[in-house]
Every structure is written in C-alpha cells, then in structure tokens.
Amino acid sequence: MKKTMFAVAMTCAAMPAFADEPDGLILPKGFHAKVVADNLGPIRHMALRGHDIYVSTRHGAKDPSVGIIALRLAPDHTVLQKANFGVGTADQGTGIKVWNGSLYAASGTAIHRFALDDMLVPTKSDVIVEGLTQSNHPIAFDGKGNLYVSIDGGGGANNCPDPKTPKDAKPVGLNPCPLLAVRGGIWRFDENKVGQKFTDGEHFATGIRNSSALDWRLGDGLYLINHGRDGTAKGWPELVSQAEDDAIPDEMFRIVKDTNMGWPYTYWDGVRKIRLSAPEYGGDGKTPVTDAKYVKPAAVFHQMRPATLDLVFYNGAQFPRSYRGGAFVAMHGGNDPAIVPGGRKGYNVMFVPFKGGKAGTPVAFAEGFAGPTPEHKNIKQATYRPVGVAVGPDGALYVADSNKGRIWRISYTGKP
C-alpha cells in the first residue's frame, strides 16, 4: 500500500498545473510561482534567512564585481531593500549558505564568513579558508562542525592530459593524475576556525569532473552531482557512438570518507549502466571497470548535457510529504548552441524522491523557463536558465535564473 501511495504522489507531482503561472512556468497541481526579484545580473546560488535572500554572483572578465546581492522581502514577497557587499572579495565562487547565524560565501579561492544580525548587510567578516584551487566551490555543512568544499577537476575537462602527447595524436591521460592532489575532489575543514589554509583541509573524497551541486541530507549524509563527460564520440568514433555519448549522464553520488567518483580514469555508461575506463586511459567503450574503489551513482540524470548546477534537499513542511527529504536540482541546460528537434535537455528543475534512504528516479518538477516552445531550450534562445535552488524558512522553494537575474518563489496551496 505504501509503495502505491508513493508512486501516486510522484505521478501527481509531474502533472501540470491548471492555473497560468508567471513566465509560462509549468508546475505540478497545487503549486504556484511568484517573481520576487528581477534584473539582478549573472547570479548563481542563494541562501535564505527569514525574509532575506543572499545571492552569489559571477561576472565576466570585463565586468565590475558586484559581490553578494542582499535582498530583504516584504511579507508579500516583494523587494523592500537591495544592497551589495563583499565586492571584489566574496564573488566568483558560487557556493553560499546561511549556517549557525552566519553567512558563508565562496570566492574563486576562499570561503568567507559574515556575521548576521538584524541588519540586511553584515558588517563583520572573516576568511575561514584561503588558498583554494580556483573553482566554483559549492559548500555544505554536516551539523558536526565540519565545512565541506568541492573543487572540480578543471573546467569540465574529460581527462588529466599528458603534455608530452603529440598535438596531432589522440589525448592521453596521466596516471596517476597530479591534478587530483589539488582539485577534482572534496575537502573538509573546521567551520569555526578562522584563517585556515587549503593545506589544512582533509582530502575527503576524489574523482569529480565538474560540479556546482553539493548539499547535506539530514539524517543521511553528503551528496554531490557530477557532470558526465562529453565529446567522446567525436574523439573516438570507433569506440563510442554519438547515441552512447549523448547517454552519458550527470550523476548524483552519496559521499563518505574516501569516496572515489572515477574522474579522470573512468566514466558512467548510461546505456549499459556500468562504469567504463575512459578512452584516454585505454578504455574500449564496452569493457566494464571492476575495481570496487569506484562508487556507483545514487541516481543518474539521463538527459544529454543537462548541466546540473545546484542541489538542495527539501526539509520544509509546506510541500506534500512525498517531497520531504527529496532533492530539488537546478538544470541549467547545455551550452551547445545547435538547435535540435525537441530542444536541448535541462532548462528546468528536477526532483529526486527518496524512500528508505535511497534515491529514486528523477522527475521533472518545474518546466517552461526557457520559453514556450521546445526549440527555446537552447543557449541562444532560452529566456531563463535555472542556476540555483534554495528552500525558505516557510518551506517555499526559490529558483534563480542566470540569464536575467530573476528569482521565483514556488509555494504550495493545494491539499497536504
């Protein structure tokens, strides 16, 4: 009976709403969206405290830094006050979270902590960790005094290239890969200790290709979503078909000490549902990797290049029970400008249900961000691209867009 109820709840969650939503968003029945902020520029992740929203930003090389954007909302969820702080220091890092009365925010090379009080803009700050390898640095906390910082493998590189490889030859990966000493993993730090160096951190997990999505699931553990490799069919058409390349998924992993997610030596085959050796390391596109040190994904996103850029577990009480403990995922959408029938994948918000501590199959939660037609799901035509998700104190879900800097608040008004 419980299994049936769970299936029905998740099926209902994928049904479109009857009421018109702003920007043509398509939501499950009983859910409604409201635009709470707009024209914020190239924003990334969000952190919420009461009626305040703190937003991390990314800007181009020729654009001025805007640091962290702070918004104070009125009871009707309209902006009362807007300010900026951390300009030139706490930006370009993506990760941002409110934790134990403070705001933690990543820059490209450090983690900053701002003391929060009744004022919107904090006046006191510390550097918790500095000297990090340049990266996005999503962050998470375990409730036991530990701060987790993710550092990707290097801009989504498929391998750890051997510089001695001739330019006209196929890429060859270094083994062992020296990059794994300083990136492609998760490092653990003391959340309260000021002035830590990168070298003070504990190398907690390894094997990340590219990731901006990291969060702690209450009563469970740390989870990360990794971007699957691309361009494999183009480089090795004799080993991997384009269909097999397109089926290489983004993967959600449950992280424990010494977890190895496989980069750069291996990748997850979405067709065969097995781990394969990367062609740069002698892989033939079909022989499974049997080494038990590589962990299996907890869930996979079978969408071609969806660009999963944020992850938040739902611990609120506003949404129906079937959502509690599950994960909302911001799918930014692939960067390939080519228009394909039916549009590119991503450009939406997905939901990963959990039952008995196990992740289920991801389902679409919010659609329509790119525009009214499937062809809008393209980097050149998309109106909006989800880049961040966060849960407010009242249990509403907030979604951030990187194209125009818009933020929606999604609430539930249906039956419990």
Model regions and ranges:
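Beta-propeller domain segments
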Residues: 20-26, 153-199, 206-210, 214-376, ...
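Beta-rich, blade/repeat-based domains predominating
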Residues: 39-51, 87-102, 106, 131-147, ...
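Residue position within the beta-strands of beta-propeller blades
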Residues: 54-56, 105, 148-150, 223-226, ...
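Beta-propeller domains
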Residues: 54-79, 117, 357
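Short loop/turn segments immediately following the C-termini of beta-strands
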Residues: 58-60, 108-110, 116, 152-154, ...
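A short loop-to-beta-strand structural motif that recurs across blades of beta-propeller domains
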Residues: 66-69, 110-112, 185-187, 251, ...
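Asp-box/WD-like beta-propeller blade repeats and closely related beta-sheet repeat scaffolds
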Residues: 81, 87, 92, 97, ...
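Blade-level signature of beta-propeller repeat domains, shared across WD40, Kelch, NHL, RCC1
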Residues: 390-416
